[in-house]
Amino acid sequence: MQIAGTVALVTGAGRGIGRALCREFRQRGAAGIVVADLDGTMAEATATELGGIGLQCDVTDAAAVRGVVNAAVARYGRVDILVSNAGLGVKALDLDDALSASDADWQRMWSVHVMAHVHACRAVLPGMLERGSGYLVNVASAAGLLSQVGDTAYSVTKHGAVGLAESLAIAYGDRGVGVSVACPQYVATTMTGLDESTAAGSLPGVLTVEQAASAIADGIEQDRFLILTHPEVLGFFQNKASDYGRWLGGMRRVRDRLRAGGFLKVKA
């Protein structure tokens, strides 16, 4: 879908990749920008910068998500592109116990990384299907294709986000609604413990939010289901599929390196 002239709604857009996406959409000629974030002040600041509307929203609350979509439709008449981007960061890694996360942590990860996408898609799909046009983007993670060593709940729920996007593409891809799942790896955000002002290329394998947003926008305009901000992830994913046992052994070696205090670096 070409972004020019569209109305885009982005969740988790008060900062990070979400905010960078709003800026990227505006640069590409979007007619309307709807910024939703748990931090309403940040959402309003981004919206003011871009001439859009900013709304506070807890993406785990289905009624709140519907309210944001209703506000977008009241202002612009429709939502053409939904980027369901809100997410939680990886917790402190537990390299020895894959089941150490509390039930509350599991539920929170599930609510944000899976059900938030469900709530958002349910809210915008009726209008898209009625018009026979629209685009859904779930922002997951490379961990949804591979795994995040030491954080099982994060990995499992990001896999769930990928699976949901697959089901959406199967159900609606021939009804005028495009679907993508974005699976970024290392991006300089507060969620990954890095500063958004990190210069491009200053850390091996780490992208700026602007680079990630540009790659995601390119994927939307090229109607690509799987959007990889880090192309090397495709090779890792193919290696996993071709020899699962070998891949698991490699991930154990990654775990051992992390246990020894090594920083996992990805070649750009």
Name the predicted role of every residue range:
Residues L88, L99-V118, S133, V137, ...:
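Catalytic Tyr-X3-Lys loop
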Residues G40-T41, C57-V68, D103:
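The beta1-alpha1 cofactor-binding region of Rossmann-like NAD(H)/NADP(H)-dependent oxidoreductases
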Residues G67-A74, L93-S100, A104-S111:
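Active-site Tyr-X3-Lys motif and surrounding loop/helix of classical short-chain dehydrogenase/reductase
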Residues C121, T157:
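Active-site helix of classical SDR
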Residues Q2-I33:
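Canonical Rossmann dinucleotide-binding motif of NAD(H)/NADP(H)-dependent dehydrogenases/reductases
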Residues R28, L146, S167-V177:
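Active-site-adjacent segment of SDR/Rossmann-fold oxidoreductases
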